[in-house]
Amino acid sequence: MAVSAPLRSLEEEVTCSICLDYLRDPVTIDCGHVFCRSCTSDIRPISGNRPVCPLCKKPFKKENIRPVWQLASLVENIERLKVDNGKQPGELAREPQDMKLCERHQEKLHYYCEDDGKLLCVMCRESREHRPHTAVLVEKAALPHREKILNHLNTLRRDRDKIQGFQAKGEADILAALTKLQEQRQYIVAEFKQGHQFLKKREQHLLDQLATLEQLLTEGREKFKTRGVSELDRLTLVISELEGKARQPAAELMQLSDRLSCLSLRYPRKKFWIGKAIPHMVKRKAGEFSDKLLSLQRGLRQFQGKLLRDLEYKTVSVTLDPQSASGYLQLSEDWKCITYTGQYQSDCLLPQQFDCEPGVLGSKGFTWGKVYWEVELEREGWSEDEEEGEEEEEGEEEEEDEEPGYGDRYEDWETDEEDESLGEEEEEEEEEEEEVQESCMVGVAKDSVKRKGNLSLRPEDGVWALRLSPSGIWANTSPEAQLFPVLRPRRVGIALDYEGGTVTFTNAESQELIYTFTTTFTRRLVPFLWLKWPEARLLLRP
């Protein structure tokens, strides 16, 4: 049966350090240590005539040995308790199984030799080998190490508490972040659902207007066809009647001379209907509907361009590489602006420099990610203000007249003789303009793009760019594709998706989507500018 910890502690207090058994007839010596009386008689003097205490090495006189009756009584009580616990009297409490014993004497190791750094039992301590050495109790020798361990243990416990605190805070932060993400997910779903509903409603509204126009034109077509057939039949009868009169003999014809003299009065041309296939008001409503479609196209392009820039791309600040700049170009001190000089100004030609083409590359390249920057074109007259003014004036003129609604019937929209007559068509003249040499290009290029000689600067050459000129805007494809944005961009946004293989151009001010190149990139890409336009500047933003 296991012995309780308090009992084991009492047993250690009444154990003789020499015989390692219960104190039998316990006595105390001058230094205060207690041993069995029989054990003290075995203590031999180390030097001189006086024996010394085995524990503290202090000499004592045998005549000063005194019995300790209280300890003797305590030993008896302990033995009685052990009997009550099922142990034989005199049997010591078992030591833990991992308690180390002296390999030589199979005794407990109570001492530590500071000279040899070894654990000693009582017999080893009294041996000739260790008697001259300084030996202290194991507990005393272990005290500094124990303190060191406890200090380090306290440090580790503090670290553990800190880590637990950090972990708890981190878990709370992660939970808060996950909660926020969930809220954002719900917000995104709700916003897009609302947006879908709004667009669906607007779509249905436009489709309803379109259906109304289709119905009006279909009804008008049937009415126009029916009335036209009726008038043709009536006119055919008149023609047949006149043809019959024209075939009459001269005598009979002369008898009708009085009637024929007023032929124009009897058969006036104005009596016959000449109508328009599409009434003026229907044409006007159809034109208004086309304007709405243009507004829809512009709004959707602006929406797409803004989402593309704000949600997916990282805005970067780029500068130009002066060593790649053509001698026809002049760079600003911050390497963000170029102007066209018209004269080659470079004294020496560098290997990485454009010679014939007035181009320049960016100093920063990209091999991954989604990045965005802007290029601003500064030149007098290059703006969309005039076009906006014209559109506003046309809109004001259209709003001045009161017009029928979409719910009116076809016949309500018919007009009088002031409307255009049937068969009248508007003539459109197309003028072929000579190719304008003044232009600029903005986009991206491979860092290995050719720079010597006359270059086409197309995608197959490693350049993906827009060309802007007074005559229009083109995508530098093969062949060139002319583009028709709603507004001429003063600032062009360039969005590069390297992994996605796209270069997208937008109007940075109106957010209108202009054009997208699609390919697979395998080399480092850099910004690309090309300018052959006097009194114009290209500036990198931001």
Curated annotation (Swiss-Prot):
Amino-acid positions noted as binding Zn(2+) in the UniProt annotation, renumbered to this chain: C102, H105, C124, H130
Record-linked SUPFAM superfamilies: B-box zinc-binding domain, Concanavalin A-like lectins/glucanases, RING/U-box
EC main group: transferase
PROSITE patterns linked to this entry: B302_SPRY (PS50188), ZF_BBOX (PS50119), ZF_RING_2 (PS50089)
EC number(s) per entry: 2.3.2.27
Biological-process GO terms, alphabetical: host-mediated suppression of symbiont invasion; innate immune response; positive regulation of non-canonical NF-kappaB signal transduction; proteasome-mediated ubiquitin-dependent protein catabolic process; protein K11-linked ubiquitination; suppression of viral release by host
UniProt-listed CDD domains: Bbox2_TRIM10-like, RING-HC_TRIM26_C-IV
Pfam families: PRY, SPRY, zf-B_box, zf-C3HC4_4
Zinc finger (RING-type): 16-57
GO cellular component: cytoplasm; nucleus
Start and end residues, zinc fingers (B box-type): 97-138
Any coiled-coil regions, as ranges: 197-243, 411-440
Family the entry assigns: Belongs to the TRIM/RBCC family.
Function noted in UniProt: E3 ubiquitin-protein ligase which regulates the IFN-beta production and antiviral response downstream of various DNA-encoded pattern-recognition receptors (PRRs). Also plays a central role in determining the response to different forms of oxidative stress by controlling levels of DNA glycosylases NEIL1, NEIL3 and NTH1 that are involved in repair of damaged DNA. Promotes nuclear IRF3 ubiquitination and proteasomal degradation. Bridges together TBK1 and NEMO during the innate response to viral infection leading to the activation of TBK1.
Protein name (database record): Tripartite motif-containing protein 26
